[in-house]
Regions:
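Short, intrinsically disordered, mixed-charge
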Residues: 19-29, 118, 122, 126, ...
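Hydrophobic ligand-binding cavity/cleft-lining segments
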Residues: 1-42
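Hydrophobic pocket/interface hotspot
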Residues: 17-21, 27, 45, 62, ...
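Short, surface-exposed coil-to-beta transition loops
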Residues: 3-5, 55-59, 80-84, 95
């Protein structure tokens, strides 16, 4: 699996940041690439994303919810991925660290995705955190 990491500082305590990140359905408002998120119950969600000129659908399950320190998920269908937000208090507020791992099954698609995905994920991650920060 390929791994992407992104870090940012938000000027708010971890409790406030975590409260926004754990509202998974609201990620639709945090990124232009997320078309919709369907709650499936029991910590599971179906994501519909348009990225790299393709539509992607995958189901994820929240695998760890430890307020206000960590929120993690893993895909259960569709694009294989897992990720985690780690929140750490710092003098300026909260350091938010995203680690995202993914695997694309098609070699042709994987090559195109690898070229575009790292800057794309970093941009989307920053967009998400900027929009979360605006709600704090």
């Amino acid at each position: 699996m390929a791994t992407i990491e992104h870090r940012a500082i938000l000027e708010a305590p971890p409790e406030r940041v975590f409260a926004l990140l754990e509202r998974v359905e609201d990620f639709v408002d945090y990124s232009d690439l997320i078309e919709r998120i369907e709650p499936l119950g029991e910590g599971r969600y179906r994501w519909h994303v348009h990225a790299v000129r393709m539509d992607w659908t995958f189901e994820v399950e929240i695998t760890e919810r430890r307020a206000p320190e960590a929120l993690a998920w893993e895909s259960r269908s569709g694009v294989r991925n897992r990720g985690r937000y780690r929140l750490t208090p710092v003098p300026e507020g909260t350091e938010v660290a995203l680690t995202l791992e993914y695997e694309i099954q098609s070699r042709l698609v994987e090559k195109a995705v690898k070229r575009a995905v790292t800057p794309l994920v970093n941009r989307v991650s920053q967009q998400i955190l900027d929009r979360v920060a605006a709600r704090l």
